[in-house]
Amino acid sequence: MNTTTRTFYLPRLEDTFSVFPDNGLNPHYAECRIQSQAWIDKYYKIVCGPKMRAYMDHCKFELITAYTYPYASSDGLRKTMDLANILWLYDEFTDTLSGKDATNAAAIVIRTLRERDFDDGSWICHMMRDFYAAHIEKFGPNVSRRFIDHFCQYVEGTGTEAKHREKDHVLDINAYIIMRRAASAVLTAFDLAEYCLGIDLPQYVHDDPAFISGYNAGLDLVFLDNDLFSYDMEQAKGHCTTNIITVVMKSKRIDLQSAFDFTAGYCESLTQQLIAAQISLASRTDPVFSNNAVKCLEAIANWVKGSDGWSFATERYFGKQNVIVKETRAVEMRKSFQDIAVLKE
């Protein structure tokens, strides 16, 4: 397995995702971003130094919601932005922790979401209490239940990932996908898609095989696409053991570029799986499936396409080279920790 290559080429997945409609950007982005930044900044000030705060501002985390929820109202978009800011901050914070400390942080989140009178005085607890009061209480009962379950799964998963990083443990492909599905933050983003559509799907829809097929295809596409973009940053941090590229290189015994190409091919298959699920559900006689469930899968497809588009609009992955990388697809791998802001700087 050749790992010495210092340049790799990203696939053009926007061509693959061109089968999904382009619904543009949400028109409420500018106003909602100001509101969401003002809210999350009080927690950034506690956790991040000025260099990291400047870096995260350049990443334009709120912009991803304008790409992925173009149909959302101002109220809905604000909810998605607050969630995005929580997820990015929590992800950066737990990346610096040991497996034990990440597990302890997860326990605080879980107790805060499940025990309404819990307050240990920590910034994590207060951030989640704020989000619950401002947003979760407004969700429908099914979306609310799933959101809390999914968020708890996500934070538990950060502890698991941290333990894998500590041990340099690389899963096989199937085990990796199962782990990511079970504990992906994208699950919570999909829950908010339901809310923004004004839909509260009954659980039997989420348990339907055709819906599961489309839902999982969209979920896999989002985190695999993200793995492609984040690989260079993660290898520079020493965190690439929990990235599909490392997983594929080890499992298939292939080189770096071949792993990118393999993953791109898998994404093409998943795209067709998502489309097939929409067609299947649209043929049902029950409007809960033929209308509401299809709308939710369309929103998931929008998430896939929008997330891919945002990844080149942000400086999150390639810094000031983002436009050049979009044009050339060439990524020159960074040396360890080069240009990576440290949390407390």
Swiss-Prot record:
Pfam families: Terpene_syn_C_2
Ligand binding ((2E,6E)-farnesyl diphosphate): R316, Y317
Catalysed transformations (reactions): (2E,6E)-farnesyl diphosphate = beta-gurjunene + diphosphate
Entry EC number(s): 4.2.3.-
MF annotations from Gene Ontology: metal ion binding; terpene synthase activity
Motif DDXXD motif location, chain numbering: 91-95
Residues that hold Mg(2+) 2 according to the record: D91
GO biological process: one example: isoprenoid biosynthetic process
Cofactor(s) the protein requires to work: Mg(2+)
Binding positions for Mg(2+) 1 per the UniProt entry: D91
Keywords assigned: Lyase, Magnesium, Metal-binding
Annotated residues for binding of Mg(2+) 3: N226, S230, E234
Domain-level remarks: The DDXXD motif is important for the catalytic activity, presumably through binding to Mg(2+).
Biological function: Terpene cyclase that catalyzes the cyclization of farnesyl diphosphate (FPP) to beta-gurjunene.
Similarity comment: Belongs to the terpene synthase family.
Protein name according to UniProt: Sesquiterpene synthase GALMADRAFT_104215
